[in-house]
């Protein structure tokens, strides 16, 4: 289902409202539930509970659908992570590159610094590893964006 905001000025009316905030929060919650359930499914598989793993996987698929529904509304006011325009592939690539760039330039280095200051060197190293991965992702999205023209 593709959701569209109805009415004159609906886009301007949604931006920065409590409903806009609620959509972003709901999108984050559904997205996190999806990833948690996939992790739980992996654990259930390892522990020998394939039926439970299937339950988690099926539910994760449902949560993905919910998150996509929220994005159908959110795309009309911008990417919930970057605020940039999303919807068409070219815009999606730019928003994805911007998000990954923020993660490798700012977020993960800051997280690593804090973890190290608090004595969690192993977690700091994990964050530093992720920063490298995010830099690679940003480069791939940027390259793909450039090939679109």
Task: Give the location of each predicted region.
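Non-heme di-metal
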Residues: 2-149
